[in-house]
Amino acid sequence: MKVIHGIRVYEKGEKVFFETEMPSIPEYMYSKFGWKIIEIDGKNYWAPMEEEEYIHIVAKYLGISPSEVDLNLVHCGTMGDNGCFGDCTGNRFCKRWSTGDSTGCICGA
């Protein structure tokens, strides 16, 4: 695992760290922009992230403004809480990231 601008980036097969103990997300569950932990009635649940939330995390990871994020260059899919898939341009690979209370995938070096 590497930390880039406060975002944890994992190599394939590495277990993702969350600050709250959470159940695994099955591989058949898909979220276009990743997952976040939400609290309802004192219990924690997984919920899909919105595009805007994903863009802000990607901008932080890349060290750029959210308005500069091009989803066509950085976006790849999120399956479960460890799986990533999709085609990335150039010498970039689809990798898992986490912030401690959210997780998703990004095309990164």
From Swiss-Prot:
Tell me what this protein is called.
Answer: Uncharacterized protein YozP
